[in-house]
Amino acid sequence: AEGVVSQGVAAIMGADCSGVTGAIATNVAVPNGVVMISPSATSPGLTTLDDKGFFFRTAPSDARGGQILADFTKDRKVKSVAITYTNNDYGKGLADVYEAAVKAHGIKVTTVAAHEDGKADYSSEVATLASAGGDAVAVIGYLDQGGKGIIQASLDSGAFDRFILSDGMIGQ
C-alpha cells in the first residue's frame, strides 16, 4: 500500500479482511490523506477507527451482523449455544457482539473459544465445545479456513447437529 500511495494513487480499494484493513488504514491511508474503501472488512473496531474521514466500507459492521445472527438464533428457538470463532479481528469482534446479543435474548452461552484457521483436524476443539454443551454451536469464521472442519468434526463425533453460521461461512 505504501508503494501505491508514494506513486500518487487517489484511493485504495481494499483490503478484504478487517485486520489488514485496519493496519493499512491506520499506517498508510489515513496518515497520507488517501481515501480507503473496503468491500468486506466488517470488524466493529473499524467503526471507531480515527480515520479523519478517509476510511469507508460497503459491508455493514459486525456490530449489526452480530445482532442479526443473535436474532436468527432466537428465531430458531436455540436455548443454549457454544461459540467458536476464528482467532482474528473479524472473528473476535463478531463473537463479542454475538455473545452479548444472544445473552440479551436470554440464550445461555455455554462457552466461547477461539480456533486457529487451516488445521487438518478440529476434533479436539469440537470435544472442548461439546463438553460445555449447547443446543447448537455457532461457528464464526471462514468456510474454507476451519469452519468446514469444525462442522465435519461435530457431525462425525455426534457432538452437534445444529449450527449457527456467520457470513464468513458462505462458500461454494
Language-model segments: what does each one mean?
Residues 2, 9-113, 162-172:
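Extracytoplasmic ligand/sensor domains, especially the bilobed periplasmic-binding protein
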Residues 29, 95-172:
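Extracellular/periplasmic bilobed ligand-binding domains
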Residues 4-11, 131-136:
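Short acidic/histidine-rich motifs immediately flanking catalytic phosphotransfer sites
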Residues 4-5, 70, 129, 158:
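Generic helix-packing signal
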